[in-house]
C-alpha cells in the first residue's frame, strides 16, 4: 500500500535514487542536496512545498550556476512557477511528477520477434535493453533498496515508439524488482512517461518544477 505521507514518498525517492546511481546526498538549509554529478547537473537541491517565500530564498543556491538545480515538489506547483525569479535563474523543466505504486504481478507483454534483449548490472543498477539488430530500441533501469524499487532512465527511441516497448520494459523491470524483494516503487516521471505509468497503475503523488542557474 502506498504511503499517505508525501514527505515519506520524497524521502523514499531520494533514498532509492541515490542508491541506484551510487551517489550521495547532504543537506542545505534543512533540505536534501543530491550530488548528482551527471552531464545535466552537478547538484540538485530538493524541497517539499516550502512556501513561495522560502522557495525564492533558496534560489540563491543555484543563481548563476548552470550546474546547480533546485527542485520543488508539491501537490500544486502553480505558485512556484509564477514566483518571481532573480536574474541568473531559469526554469529547466516543469512537467515532471513524483509517482508511486504497489508492484503487482502483471503479465509481461510479448517481445516482438525481431527484438533481442540483454541485462547489464552495474553496482545497484540493473539495466534491461531491447535491441533491433545493432540499434537500441528501448532501455530502462531498476534499483532495489529493501522493499522499495525505483525505475530510472526508461526510454523508447523515437524510431521504435508506439509499439508497446515501454510497457514491456517496465513490466520486465517490475518482475525483476519483485524477484529481488521489492513490493513498492517510486520514481520521477516525465510527462510522456507519466502517461505510461498511469496506465500501469502508478499514482501521481506530487508535481515537480526544477530551476537551474544560468
Task: Please place each PLM-identified region on the residue numbering.
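N-terminal charged segments
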Residues: 1-69, 73-79
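Short secondary-structure junctions
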Residues: 20-35, 85-93, 116-117, 203-204
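Conserved acetyl-CoA-binding loop-helix of GNAT-fold acetyltransferases
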Residues: 54-58, 156, 162-179, 199
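Conserved GNAT acetyl-CoA-binding A-motif
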Residues: 64-74, 177-189
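Conserved active-site alpha-helix within GNAT-family acetyltransferase domains
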Residues: 77-90, 167, 179, 191-208, ...
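Acyltransferase donor/substrate-recognition loop-hinge adjacent to the catalytic core
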Residues: 85-126
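C-terminal "cap" of GNAT-fold acetyltransferases
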Residues: 95-105, 188-191, 210-214
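A conserved beta-strand-loop-helix scaffold within acyl/acetyltransferase catalytic domains
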Residues: 119-157
Amino acid at each position: 500500500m502506498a504511503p499517505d505521507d508525501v514527505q515519506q514518498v520524497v524521502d523514499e525517492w531520494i533514498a532509492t535514487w541515490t542508491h541506484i546511481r551510487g551517489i550521495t546526498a547532504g543537506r542545505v538549509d534543512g533540505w536534501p542536496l543530491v550530488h548528482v554529478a551527471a552531464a545535466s547537473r552537478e547538484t540538485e537541491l530538493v524541497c517539499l512545498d516550502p512556501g513561495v517565500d522560502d522557495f525564492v530564498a533558496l534560489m540563491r543556491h543555484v543563481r548563476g550556476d548552470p550546474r546547480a538545480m533546485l527542485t520543488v515538489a508539491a501537490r500544486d506547483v502553480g505558485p512556484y512557477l509564477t514566483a518571481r525569479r532573480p536574474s541568473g535563474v531559469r526554469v529547466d523543466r516543469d512537467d515532471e511528477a513524483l509517482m508511486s505504486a504497489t508492484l503487482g504481478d502483471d503479465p509481461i507483454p510479448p517481445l516482438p520477434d525481431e527484438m533481442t534483449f540483454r541485462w547489464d548490472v552495474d553496482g545497484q543498477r540493473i539495466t534491461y535493453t531491447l535491441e533491433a539488430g545493432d540499434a537500441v530500441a528501448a532501455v530502462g533501469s531498476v534499483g532495489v533498496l529493501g522493499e522499495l524499487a525505483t525505475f530510472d532512465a526508461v526510454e523508447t527511441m523515437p524510431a521504435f515508439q508506439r509499439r508497446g516497448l515501454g510497457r514491456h520494459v517496465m513490466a520486465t523491470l517490475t518482475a525483476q524488482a519483485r524477484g529481488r524483494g521489492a513490493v513498492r516503487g517510486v520514481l520521477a516521471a516525465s510527462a510522456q512517461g507519466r502517461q505510461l505509468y498511469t496506465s500501469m497503475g502508478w499514482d501521481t503523488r506530487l508535481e515537480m518544477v526544477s530551476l537551474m542557474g544560468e
